[in-house]
Amino acid sequence: MAKHLFTSESVSEGHPDKIADQISDAVLDAILEQDPKARVACETYVKTGMVLVGGEITTSAWVDIEEITRNTVREIGYVHSDMGFDANSCAVLSAIGKQSPDINQGVDRADPLEQGAGDQGLMFGYATNETDVLMPAPITYAHRLVQRQAEVRKNGTLPWLRPDAKSQVTFQYDDGKIVGIDAVVLSTQHSEEIDQKSLQEAVMEEIIKPILPAEWLTSATKFFINPTGRFVIGGPMGDCGLTGRKIIVDTYGGMARHGGGAFSGKDPSKVDRSAAYAARYVAKNIVAAGLADRCEIQVSYAIGVAEPTSIMVETFGTEKVPSEQLTLLVREFFDLRPYGLIQMLDLLHPIYKETAAYGHFGREHFPWEKTDKAQLLRDAAGLK
């Protein structure tokens, strides 16, 4: 592959779909705090003046879903009716059932290690050495832009900003290496009083320049800041939001494949979530060990069965040891059975709400971002 462009996007915590994701994961965290063995599948729908929380939850815990919802919306920043959505006055509806006993009998086992997968499915994990966090650069910097938007909105640097925002970054590659940034898009909701020129200048100086490395920006880099000219109506007033609709933003920005399953609102018995985290952990440790420059892991499951139905390692020709050896190393050093990976990554804790905005991968404090097996893999592979 010679010269090419690659684009990834992200959305802020105030985007309607991300509001829904954060509410679903806030409910999950509140339940796990009381009942780590709970079964949770929590879906959220948001629209002007309304939040609907539904799903299947089996737990001994009691949580106040209305209070959790209002607090989450309040933390995001929707606290006044002039934003079209207000944590203090929106209606909160709840439609929660219990997990089907047919599913439950396939998951629970007397021996925890034999815990079956909560569903069939395929999951991918990915890592690349093109950034310090072993993530693709386009999605990494797209996330950082909208994180910065939230930071300068909340700390009062740009008080006319509102919670809804989107970013998009197009990188230039030459023979697989980054040579620059071709285009940057940043659209942010704002209050009525700010004019377009002032907004564009402030966004450039306070959001874009502090985040994007200067060596990747040239006179040819194109910037599109609120290109429609106005973004006052946003959030759930502009679009309805739904849990699980930003699965590419949540993962690798399109740089790696995706099995199709969303993450937010699901407890770790759901392999859609936990096995995708484990696959990232495996891929990141392989790259951190220097066994490959890029690595994609696929793992698949059958409902009610503990052992994965398949494990695949793809290194795109960048491997330093034979691919067959990599697969054997994965099977030796990583327990990818549902209970095994829950234990390996210590997933039965309320750690999920923070994952629900700005990406599930690439932030070092999450347990699946550890590289604690890199040296073991390197030694076992015989690399000096």
UniProtKB/Swiss-Prot annotation:
Highest rank taxon of the organism: Bacteria
E.C. designation(s): 2.5.1.6
Phenotype when changing C240A: Decrease in AdoMet synthesis
Class of enzymatic activity (EC top level): transferase
Protein's pathway: Amino-acid biosynthesis; S-adenosyl-L-methionine biosynthesis; S-adenosyl-L-methionine from L-methionine: step 1/1
Catalytic activity: L-methionine + ATP + H2O = S-adenosyl-L-methionine + phosphate + diphosphate
Effect in UniProt of substituting D272 to N/A: Loss of activity
One example GO MF annotation: magnesium ion binding
N6-acetyllysine PTM positions: K3
Pfam family, one: S-AdoMet_synt_N
Impact noted for substituting K266A: Loss of activity
Binding site for ATP: H15, D164, A165, K166, R230, F231, D239, R245, K246, A262, K266
Compartments where found: Cytoplasm
Cofactor note: Binds 2 divalent ions per subunit. The ions interact primarily with the substrate.
Positions annotated to bind L-methionine: E56, Q99, D239, K270
Alphabetized PANTHER family for the sequence: S-ADENOSYLMETHIONINE SYNTHETASE
Assembly description: Homotetramer; dimer of dimers. The active sites are at the interface between subunits; each dimer has two active sites. (Microbial infection) Interacts with enterobacteria phage T3 S-Adenosylmethionine lyase; this interaction induces the polymerization of METK into filaments that are enzymatically inactive.
NCBIfam families named in the record: metK (TIGR01034)
The protein's name in its UniProt record: S-adenosylmethionine synthase
